[in-house]
From Swiss-Prot:
Database matches in HAMAP family: ClpP
First-level EC class: hydrolase
Family that this chain belongs to: Belongs to the peptidase S14 family.
GO cellular component: cytoplasm; endopeptidase Clp complex
Entry's Gene Ontology BP terms: protein quality control for misfolded or incompletely synthesized proteins
Keyword field: Cytoplasm, Hydrolase, Protease, Serine protease
Stored InterPro entries: ClpP, ClpP/crotonase-like_dom_sf, ClpP/TepA, ClpP_His_AS, ClpP_Ser_AS
Species name: Nitratidesulfovibrio vulgaris (strain DSM 19637 / Miyazaki F)
Descriptive protein name: ATP-dependent Clp protease proteolytic subunit
Gene Ontology MF terms in the entry: ATP-dependent peptidase activity; ATPase binding; serine-type endopeptidase activity
Function: Cleaves peptides in various proteins in a process that requires ATP hydrolysis. Has a chymotrypsin-like activity. Plays a major role in the degradation of misfolded proteins.
Length: 201
């Protein structure tokens, strides 16, 4: 699908931006695809750029993603934690798997969802082929990743890690109200005014 172009006029000059570059001017990053290495590189680059522009000002990460690669998602997660700019997260559509972890990883009090979005958490999965010893190595790595992801989710939600481990054994779907109760988000927004009021509190 072609990327929309936005024309801005100032004085006698005009400037054309693709829509994502224009949103970046307002410190908005849109994660609207499955998460892979290429997507993670783009998101990380935008986070680092916006931090360099103003390390104290909020960055807004809008998430509509079914999840994807754990290692790619962790690159985004670690960058969010590394930079000094607070990262506000907002789920529109869905935040599933690694998308849900990134949603929960937003700055405290700045994690939101729109009213008809959905959130899903589960354990990492992987299929392996090859010699039995190689399969065993990969299986142990998946268990290590699973434990690490459970600890991260528990830290950001305030849930006991044992509950997170139980809940992620299978796909666990939540609406915004359930996600708020779980601790993945802090508020449900129906309009931009809600976000402004939350920031003012």
């Amino acid at each position: 699908m072609p990327v929309p172009i936005v024309i801005e006029t100032s004085g006698r000059s005009e400037r054309a931006y693709d829509i994502y570059s224009r949103l970046l001017k307002d410190r908005i990053i849109l994660l609207g695809t499955p998460i892979d290495d290429q997507v993670a590189s783009l998101i990380c680059a935008q986070l680092l750029f916006l931090e360099s522009e103003n390390p104290e000002k909020e960055i807004y990460l809008y998430i509509n993603s079914p999840g994807g690669s754990v290692t790619a998602g962790m690159a985004i997660y670690d960058t969010m934690q590394y930079i000094t700019s607070p990262v506000a997260t907002l789920c529109l559509g869905q935040a599933a798997s690694m998308g849900a972890l990134l949603l929960a990883a937003g700055a405290p009090g700045m994690r939101h969802a729109l009213p008809n979005s959905r959130i899903m958490i589960h354990q990492p999965s992987g299929g392996f082929h090859g010699q039995a010893s190689d399969i065993d190595i990969h299986a142990r790595e998946v268990l290590r990743m699973k434990a690490n992801l459970n600890e991260i989710m528990a830290r950001h939600t305030g849930q006991p890690v044992e509950r997170v481990a139980d809940d992620t054994e299978r796909d666990y779907f939540m609406g915004p109200a359930e996600a708020k109760e779980y601790g993945i988000i802090d508020s449900i927004l129906t309009s931009r005014r809600d976000a402004t009021q939350n920031q003012a509190k």
